[in-house]
């Protein structure tokens, strides 16, 4: 035994001298696991006729195979949902699978089927590694292609053929900007793979464990704001000596306290701010602002924007725009660790678009888009990576909004929903909206080409319809209206659409448009009509609020156009409600 150990130790030393530490580790591992044959005493139960490597005591312990957990699926779900869930869990090894039925979300939820009709079911799952996700995504793509005869749209799947040299070059490009240890910038590929299957409205998200903790998509697709948030968060005690190291920042506790103080001032401004007191609020905010965190800069953008909308002389739109530039040129933030700059850039582009939309008629549509183009160019140059803006619903909505010019915000689906929720007490301001026809065509085509299957979702077509109505383009309005009515699958949803359309027309208050609604679509014997869908929906509205607002809307139209016979049938209908 002693002689054998000396021989192997000598071999290890020679290996270290000739080949370095790698072979040394292999030899050491061999020494550790090699059984001792020359024992002074042998176990009496050992069968000497069996080679040592086949003996039971030298076999590794058998690990029990964990049973794959399949989440409970909605009863009304199509068979394809169960098929894909079992496929990724049982065949591809994706764990912690969760399924979200977007039809169960409330109407005002940003991911509900009432707001967007493309996604109906969301599947979330965790992969073991980036390579695992790449392999699973590749197999999933081939499976859907051959079994469902459609080509899924997959994002985040990057081939492993990117070599070390290319990755080093990407890293050098990123290093020119502030450090961003939590942002991939195209280097950490396949940490989040999204697959729009094209099958029954099913979208699959597969992420690594770390990426899933960071993104917390569960909150996005759940009605509960704190949905299992503790499941994918690290439990780090503030008193832990490694608190800062684990979080990846230096003095963030102090910084967050400062950001909280700024939030108090901001909330007080929203609640109690008046024109005469704006300067006092601004002075208080500026005195607290230190610029030591992205949270402070983000709060400053929101704060200054509110003041600018209330008093353009105190804070101009250009001053709000300068805050973004100050944020990305800050030396303090450049030294801060743990900032997801990719996420910050995406959010700031959206905020900048909101600013351009809120300034009213200060800029023409062409000027707005030129300013947006310059801003996006500056931001993407900073990140060193492209930002997939057209995959964000709010970006598409705001981009369409920027094709118009108006002194007030347009009436949209959110405003109409507020009218219903308040039983008609909310009165939106509606007036003339101008739209640049050339820019409208360009933005519409650009958006269409960027969408899956180049098909506009229903919510976007509804937004276009509302814009056409407020710009007076009634031919386009009724074209979109007819297309939407035909695309809505159930009579229940169409009843809601009939209600919202009438509310919109009553607020715009165009006589010809109202007459078209009541003469062509109220009780048409051929094609779609309100009365047909109302009867199919068991002669009822979807809520008491809808019934109350619909009745009041028809009565208001009667008061405005009392002598016109084209709405008499509707007036008689609501009298019996």
Swiss-Prot record:
Transit peptide, UniProt annotation: 1-38
Membrane topology: Peripheral membrane protein
A UniProt-annotated Pfam family: RsfS
Keywords: Membrane, Mitochondrion, Mitochondrion inner membrane, Transit peptide
InterPro entries: Atp25, NT_sf
Gene Ontology CC: mitochondrial inner membrane
Keyword Mitochondrion appears in the UniProt entry: yes
Function description: Probable mitochondrial mRNA stabilization factor.
Family: Belongs to the ATP25 family.
Protein name from the UniProt record: ATPase synthesis protein 25, mitochondrial
Biological source species: Candida tropicalis (strain ATCC MYA-3404 / T1)
């Amino acid at each position: 035994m002693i002689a054998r150990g000396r021989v192997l130790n000598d071999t290890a030393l020679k290996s270290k001298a000739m080949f370095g530490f790698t072979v040394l580790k292999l030899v050491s591992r061999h020494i550790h696991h090699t059984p001792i044959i020359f024992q002074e005493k042998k176990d009496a139960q050992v069968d000497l006729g069996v080679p040592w490597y086949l003996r039971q005591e030298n076999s590794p312990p058998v690990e029990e195979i964990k049973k794959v957990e399949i989440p409970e699926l909605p009863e009304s779900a199509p068979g394809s949902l169960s098929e894909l869930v079992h496929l990724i869990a049982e065949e591809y090894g994706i764990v912690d699978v969760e399924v979200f039925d977007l039809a169960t979300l409330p109407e005002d939820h940003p991911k509900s089927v009432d707001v967007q009709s493309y996604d109906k079911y969301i599947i979330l799952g965790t992969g073991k590694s980036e390579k695992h996700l790449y392999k699973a995504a590749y197999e999933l793509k081939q499976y859907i292609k051959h079994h469902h005869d459609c080509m899924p749209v997959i994002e985040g799947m990057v081939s492993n053929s990117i070599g070390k040299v290319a990755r080093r070059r990407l890293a050098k490009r990123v290093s020119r900007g502030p450090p961003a240890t939590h942002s991939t910038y195209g280097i950490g590929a396949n940490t989040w793979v999204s697959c729009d299957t094209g099958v029954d409205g099913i979208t699959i998200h597969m992420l690594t464990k770390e990426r899933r903790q960071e993104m917390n998509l569960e909150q996005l697709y759940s009605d509960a704001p704190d949905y299992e948030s503790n499941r994918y968060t690290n439990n780090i005690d503030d008193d832990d000596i490694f608190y800062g190291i684990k979080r990846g920042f230096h003095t963030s506790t102090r910084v967050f306290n400062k950001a909280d103080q700024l939030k108090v001032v901001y909330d007080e401004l929203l609640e109690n701010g008046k024109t005469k007191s704006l300067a006092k609020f601004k002075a208080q905010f500026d005195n607290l602002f230190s610029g030591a965190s992205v949270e402070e800069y983000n709060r400053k953008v929101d704060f200054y924007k509110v003041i600018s909308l209330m008093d353009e002389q105190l804070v101009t739109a250009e001053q709000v725009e300068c805050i973004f530039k100050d944020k990305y040129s800050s030396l303090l933030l450049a030294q801060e660790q743990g900032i997801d700059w990719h996420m910050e850039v995406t959010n700031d582009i959206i905020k900048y678009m909101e600013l351009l939309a809120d300034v009213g008629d200060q800029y023409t549509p062409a000027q707005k888009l030129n300013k947006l183009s310059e801003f996006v160019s500056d931001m993407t140059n900073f990140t060193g990576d492209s930002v997939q803006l057209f995959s964000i619903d709010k970006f598409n909505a705001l981009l369409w909004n920027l094709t118009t010019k108006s002194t007030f915000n347009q009436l949209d689906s959110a405003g109409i929903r507020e009218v219903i929720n308040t039983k008609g007490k909310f009165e939106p301001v509606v007036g003339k909206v101008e739209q640049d026809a050339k820019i409208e065509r360009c933005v519409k085509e650009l958006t269409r080409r960027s969408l899956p299957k180049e098909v506009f979702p229903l919510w976007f077509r509804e937004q276009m319809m509302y814009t056409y109505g407020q710009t007076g383009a009634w031919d386009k309005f009724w074209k979109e209206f007819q297309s939407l009515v035909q695309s809505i699958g159930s009579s229940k949803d169409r009843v809601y659409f009939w209600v919202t359309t009438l509310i919109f027309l009553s607020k715009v208050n165009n006589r010809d448009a109202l007459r078209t609604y009541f003469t062509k679509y109220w009780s048409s014997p051929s094609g779609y009509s309100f009365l047909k869908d109302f009867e199919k929906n068991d002669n009822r509205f979807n809520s008491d609020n809808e019934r109350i607002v619909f009745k009041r809307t028809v009565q208001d139209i009667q008061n405005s156009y009392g002598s016109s016979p084209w709405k008499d049938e509707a007036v008689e209908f609501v009298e019996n409600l």
